[in-house]
């Protein structure tokens, strides 16, 4: 019965709370879109959130019953595709891989141009040029380049605060 489950959920809400919600994507289980691996940072973030004792802070500052929407929501995604919805959480941490031009000769196959979801790669002479303003650091162009003309440049994370929708919040 839906109503009974809803009552149990609402009655147990305060005992289920930790002061934060930490989610991550399925990237570590083999997602082909991974720009970086978040396996090592998720436990570290969880430890920091537990150490901060956000639940005690919420109990002191929130008048009335605590609800899940009071908790700090943090999500980690291994790529800008953001299947774990970091854009709509209080803190979103997105994996990023910026391409870098190497000394390897370009064969002009245009695989990098075709795979870029933002049309940030253009083929010029002598090879690909990445528009840094349009690039979302997904690393797809790096992954498909058969000659490694586009190699892995800077990798890391982009942090978004405040929760907004869209690929370009």
Q: Where are the regions that the model predicts?
A:
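Small-residue-enriched alpha-helical segments and adjacent helix-cap loops
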Residues: 1-107, 115, 129-136, 165
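Short, intrinsically disordered, charge-balanced linker/junction segments flanking boundaries
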Residues: 156-169
């Amino acid at each position: 019965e839906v109503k009974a489950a809803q009552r149990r959920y609402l009655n147990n809400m305060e005992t289920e709370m930790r002061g934060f919600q930490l989610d991550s994507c399925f990237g570590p289980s083999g997602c082909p879109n991974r720009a970086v691996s978040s396996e090592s940072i998720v436990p570290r973030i969880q430890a920091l959130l537990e150490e901060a004792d956000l639940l005690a802070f919420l109990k002191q500052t929130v008048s009335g019953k605590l609800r899940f929407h009071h908790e700090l929501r943090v999500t980690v995604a291994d790529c800008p595709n953001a299947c774990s919805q970091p854009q709509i959480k209080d803190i979103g941490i997105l994996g990023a891989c910026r391409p870098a031009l190497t000394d390897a000769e370009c064969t002009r196959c245009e695989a990098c141009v075709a795979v870029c979801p933002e049309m940030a790669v253009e083929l010029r002479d002598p090879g690909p040029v990445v528009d840094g303003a349009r690039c979302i650091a997904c690393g797809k162009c790096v992954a498909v380049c058969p000659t490694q003309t586009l190699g892995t440049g800077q990798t890391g994370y982009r942090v978004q605060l405040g929760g907004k929708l869209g690929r370009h919040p």
